[in-house]
Amino acid sequence: MSSKEQKMPDEQVSEDMEVVSEQQNSADKAEASETESVVDPRVAELEEQLKQAQQRERDAILRAKAEVENIRRRTEQDVEKAHKFALERFANELLPVIDNLERALEVADRTNTEIAPMVEGIELTLKSFLGAVGKFGIEVVGDTNVPFNPEIHQAMTMMESDQHEPNHVMMVMQKGYTLNGRLLRPAMVAVSK
């Protein structure tokens, strides 16, 4: 036998194997396409569920970040308020001292030359004291001829007046004070009708 004749059956076998392999591949492809069409709705459903879960997670992360930012902002505001109004209790204790210095000046006999240095000392002390508390944000509320404001004034009486417009402060009986814009004590006033 020649070598040519021996190759023939081997070639035949390899060709047969290729044909069988191609048939198997096409059968696998057909089966895969059938499987894809069967699995496709389920895969689509799972992909949709995955997208929804990812969106929920993104939303949860955004909400958590926003909440952290809100907490940080509130904490900063609380700290700022604590710094700003830490003196409130102390300032309330100082108000009677200011009132007493003002009353001392009101009743002092300014015509008596013997007590003139004392009156001048009280005036300077009051001025210095008001300057010192003013540096810390304490301001006086007690102007006359201004519109009555219930947020900073406490009306003690209402009086008829031709010299003042209606609902204006005519007289201040006791001055009020604010600390950085927050009312410490309202001004006690007489209001025109």
Curated annotation (Swiss-Prot):
Residues 1-45 are annotated as: Disordered. GO terms for biological process: protein folding. Pfam families: GrpE. Residues 1-10 have a biased composition (Basic and acidic residues). CDD domains: GrpE. It is found in: Cytoplasm. SUPFAM superfamilies: Coiled-coil domain of nucleotide exchange factor GrpE, Head domain of nucleotide exchange factor GrpE. Keywords: Chaperone, Cytoplasm, Stress response. GO terms for molecular function: adenyl-nucleotide exchange factor activity; protein homodimerization activity; protein-folding chaperone binding; unfolded protein binding. It comes from the Bacteria. One of its GO terms (cellular component) is cytosol. Belongs to the GrpE family. Homodimer. NCBIfam families: PRK14139.1 (NF010737), PRK14140.1 (NF010738), PRK14150.1 (NF010748). HAMAP family: GrpE (MF_01151). Participates actively in the response to hyperosmotic and heat shock by preventing the aggregation of stress-denatured proteins, in association with DnaK and GrpE. It is the nucleotide exchange factor for DnaK and may function as a thermosensor. Unfolded proteins bind initially to DnaJ; upon interaction with the DnaJ-bound protein, DnaK hydrolyzes its bound ATP, resulting in the formation of a stable complex. GrpE releases ADP from DnaK; ATP binding to DnaK triggers the release of the substrate protein, thus completing the reaction cycle. This is Protein GrpE. It comes from Photorhabdus laumondii subsp. laumondii (strain DSM 15139 / CIP 105565 / TT01) (Photorhabdus luminescens subsp. laumondii). The lineage of its organism: Bacteria, Pseudomonadati, Pseudomonadota, Gammaproteobacteria, Enterobacterales.
